[in-house]
């Protein structure tokens, strides 16, 4: 079994300086206590498609020991008007930081189910990025051990504040 931390114990952020930029210091951001996905129908979006992460998740011991590729696609819902008007990264969400945070989170933690990995990732993003109103995460497992040829197995979840 891996010596990786469980999500409940995760409070430390690791990574490059790039991965720390843009988190929680967005001057124009206002956290919204609760929204629904109906509220986000016309919201602005940051889209990250096909982020590849090598991590150790799975029900079978071999998956945890050897690791495998996961492919993450994200939609972050936020008000990006100020970023567009002022051409300022400080008024937006740094997608480079988001990518590094997702990569670090999935490498740092071990889950049996990709449903749990997606849920933990969604909650981490909502905590670290106060201007994110909601998130859609698609987490694919292209090397899923099902014994048949397939392109990928995965889950897609949506979470809001």
Language-model features: locations:
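N-terminal, polar/charged subdomain of small-to-medium soluble alpha/beta proteins
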Residues: 2-161
């Amino acid at each position: 079994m891996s010596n990786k931390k469980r999500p409940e114990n995760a409070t430390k952020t690791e990574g490059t300086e790039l991965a720390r930029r843009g988190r929680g210091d967005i001057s124009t951001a206002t956290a919204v206590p609760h929204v629904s996905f109906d509220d986000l129908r016309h919201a602005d979006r940051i889209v990250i498609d096909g982020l590849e992460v090598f991590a150790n998740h799975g029900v079978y011991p071999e998956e945890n020991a050897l690791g495998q590729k996961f492919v993450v696609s994200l939609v972050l819902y936020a008000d990006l008007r100020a970023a567009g008007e002022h051409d300022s990264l400080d008024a937006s969400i740094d997608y480079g930081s988001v990518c590094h945070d997702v990569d670090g989170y999935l490498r740092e933690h071990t889950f049996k189910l990709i449903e749990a990995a997606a849920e933990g990732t969604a909650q981490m993003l909502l905590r670290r990025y106060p201007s994110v109103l909601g998130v859609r995460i698609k987490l694919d497992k292209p090397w899923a051990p099902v014994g048949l040829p397939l392109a990928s197995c995965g889950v897609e979840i949506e979470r809001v504040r």
